[in-house]
Amino acid sequence: MPQLLRNVLCVIETFHKYASEDSNGATLTGRELKQLIQGEFGDFFQPCVLHAVEKNSNLLNIDSNGIISFDEFVLAIFNLLNLCYLDIKSLLSSELRQVTKPEKEKLDDVDVQATTGDGQWTVGTSPTQEKRMLPSGMASSSQLIPEESGAVGNNRVDPWREAKTHNFPGEASEHNDPKNKHLEGDEQSQEVAQDIQTTEDNEGQLKTNKPMAGSKKTSSPTERKGQDKEISQEGDEPAREQSVSKIRDQFGEQEGNLATQSSPPKEATQRPCEDQEVRTEKEKHSNIQEPPLQREDEPSSQHADLPEQAAARSPSQTQKSTDSKDVCRMFDTQEPGKDADQTPAKTKNLGEPEDYGRTSETQEKECETKDLPVQYGSRNGSETSDMRDERKERRGPEAHGTAGQKERDRKTRPLVLETQTQDGKYQELQGLSKSKDAEKGSETQYLSSEGGDQTHPELEGTAVSGEEAEHTKEGTAEAFVNSKNAPAAERTLGARERTQDLAPLEKQSVGENTRVTKTHDQPVEEEDGYQGEDPESPFTQSDEGSSETPNSLASEEGNSSSETGELPVQGDSQSQGDQHGESVQGGHNNNPDTQRQGTPGEKNRALEAVVPAVRGEDVQLTEDQEQPARGEHKNQGPGTKGPGAAVEPNGHPEAQESTAGDENRKSLEIEITGALDEDFTDQLSLMQLPGKGDSRNELKVQGPSSKEEKGRATEAQNTLLESLDEDNSASLKIQLETKEPVTSEEEDESPQELAGEGGDQKSPAKKEHNSSVPWSSLEKQMQRDQEPCSVERGAVYSSPLYQYLQEKILQQTNVTQEEHQKQVQIAQASGPELCSVSLTSEISDCSVFFNYSQASQPYTRGLPLDESPAGAQETPAPQALEDKQGHPQRERLVLQREASTTKQ
């Protein structure tokens, strides 16, 4: 950092140094900029570069005010220097290496002479000039680069070193490459130890390159262009972009080399032609002598083509030239696009050595070129190795950086290509990788991003984080692996499985469950999109939390709640789901233990059974509620995240409970068996169930009353909340005392909750209908709700226990209905508010809990449209928070029980 700071300060000082005309030294004129570039960079850039900078100095004047500010200078000068940066660095490194090169060159000259037959180590300043020419003339650069590829292939000398023997004899030697190659082969045999590694790398490349060897050997820009196109098609566009910078770097390097190796560009142009000739001959020889040429010409032609491609083809081609191995990879992935799967491994293997940098590629290339130099001359080999070392250095920064990125990108891309070849869908791969990433923590976000309900994703994040922590152990990995390996498929499958579980319920309650089925069927389809929204918030909590069952549950729950996510837009089932969730979660929050216990089984059953019925009614009522619930849910769901968000998660918990209820019903049927054995439990649950049905119906009765009665309902809510709080504490005590009864209670209660939720879902309507509906309608509705529950339960679970439970529920429901009828009559006599208060308070504790949260939260939702009472809303907000907090726990318990019961 101190060095960086000094460098930055040096830049600033340099800027101010030349900004003399400005008293503040804050701006530069075009003349001062020219002076700055000449004074500071004149040693690195040729006059043509400085002239180009001067000519294009207006580019630095971003704001066109004739003055170049420091920020403009920094931005623009680095854009200009970007092409020259590597050249500068390569020049610096080449200067250091050129010191050592003469020795190597002396040794290599002999080899080069032997290999090239000329032994003429024509310091190819022209190569760099040719490269220099490349910026000016890409066509010649393609030719020059072929020359370079030929000459460099033969005498691959660092262009930085001016050691590229653009030896036409070298070309002849390349024409004589077979011989030279054999000689070089001998030299290679001598350098095999070195070459083995490099050749192994090269062979890995050559393996990948061999399919490409012909093209790379030929190194015909067209072939590579085609390959580059393929590669670019397969994702080399980023690589191309990177290669563009690399090409620029190469050109900059070339230009830098030209600067250091200023020589007649004529040689460059001449050598391009000769390079073309050599190239054709190389192609011939490379085609003839593919194994050696593959190793030699491929590296050389690859390297030659690399600049050539860089110049003639495109940055992407240059990428491949710079990334010949990347090209090999890409060709492996592309030509082996067929072999993409194998190529990724090869390219990965190549990439692995290349992981430390495409410098390793360049090193391998250097090794290849070393092989070539060995073939073409060990001097050239060392030179080419030095060249590539320099290129590594030059490219090293970017080659290591961009090449490393490209390697990673291409490794991932080969993987992507593999998966593409495997899946045939790159997007699916992205989806899988995203799903993997999502699995890694964006799972909820993935779902939520799909769901798009991000308030729920937040809830998901929190609840899921907790429940995932707990239930991820159980099945989050499975759930997300499943849901994300086949994110849409398995989720949809799981959701559809759950939906199928619910399907009988949905089918039976099709009319009623139209939205339920929508919330299940559509969400199954939409689950991918919506499951992230609402399903995730609550269910992702439970889904991710207890993703074993929640996978399906997440699907179903994602279904119902995902459509509930849709329904937030719809506002019906979302408000329903939210109200269900609220009532359920409210009940859960109020009776977390009881509901956690009971919720898994019958709660979910009841949720499913009642949810269809409740939803069927809720479809009607929530249609009434839709507008208020939508507005409320929108207001409270997104707005008041306390009640709304918790409610939405609760709505999802409803779906979760209904979906979890599928499994929970299964698991809790077992639990229900024991729980059913206890008539007290059944009685409690049944009494609470009718209570909830009554409260639901009562709420329904309360619902239709009107907005005025909503105000009363709000007051009733407040009173209910108080009475419900008392009842909640009492019922919690009772339920905690009789946890098993509570379990069956809650199981029964779950239907009641569902009924209550339905009531709460209806509760907006109930709010509207608070005391306007007679108790008989409440009984009827309760019966309807409970009948669908029993029917759905029977449909979903036709077990005798379930039937037995249903019978007891019906019996006790009748008893409780009678009691509640009396209470309702009394309450109705006392008034709608008293009705709601007395009924909800008299409703079974669990139902009171559910009704409490249901009434409070649904009221909060229903009321926010018209008269959202602050008390009701505030209370639901804590309840929503409790639901958020307690519900995940309840869901956890429920999901844990579900998991345990499912395991059982």
UniProtKB/Swiss-Prot annotation:
Q: Where is the composition biased (Low complexity)?
A: 555-578
Q: Which residues form the EF-hand domain?
A: 48-83
Compositional bias, Basic and acidic residues, is annotated for 172-185, 222-240, 268-300, 349-371, 385-398, 759-770, 881-890
Record's superkingdom?
A: Eukaryota
Single Gene Ontology MF annotation? transition metal ion binding
Polar residues bias (residue ranges): 113-128, 443-452, 538-554, 586-598, 771-780
Q: Where is the composition biased (Acidic residues)?
A: 524-536
**Region of interest called Disordered, as start-end residue ranges on this chain:** 102-792, 858-890
CDD domains in the cross-refs: S-100 (cd00213)
Q: List the PANTHER family.
A: TRICHOHYALIN-LIKE PROTEIN 1 (PTHR47612:SF1)
Q: What is this protein called?
A: Trichohyalin-like protein 1
UniProt organism field: Homo sapiens (Human)
